[in-house]
Amino acid sequence: LVSYGYLWNMIRVQGGAYGTGMNVRSNGDVFCYSYRDPNVENSLAVYGGIPDFLAEFLSQGMPMDDIIIGTVNTTEPLLDPAGVCELECIRYLKGTTAADISRIRREILGTTAEKLLKLAEPLRAYAENGKFCAVGSKNAVAFLNK
């Protein structure tokens, strides 16, 4: 929802970056990224707008089905045999169990607009107090010296 519904349009399409997204790790860490981004300063401001985007989008009362299906698709992608082996290796190394996978799927399928809206405030705190790292040419990151 955030990566393709908001960041892609604001940072990739309008801002000209080659790519962008948001990721939430199982330990609760949240990070946003862009790459080959000609306007890093704008992208940082866009990341700060994620809570408002969520609030506005979810207030429209749209069905959650497409969002849930898209999320399941990212957690259970179609894979060839080599991809299955790679995924199982990663799960083994991370200690991810079948019970973990089932729990995550239940949480995804049980997602509601209200539950997503509750994430807006922690994301707002992240945007206001989070750390960032910018790697680029001297001109691309000159705004950091302001």
Per-segment meaning from a language model:
Residues 1-46, 106-127, 146:
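Non-catalytic beta-strand/loop surface segments
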Residues 22-79:
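M16/insulysin-pitrilysin zinc metalloprotease superfamily fold
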Residues 68, 72-146:
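C-terminal regions of mature proteins
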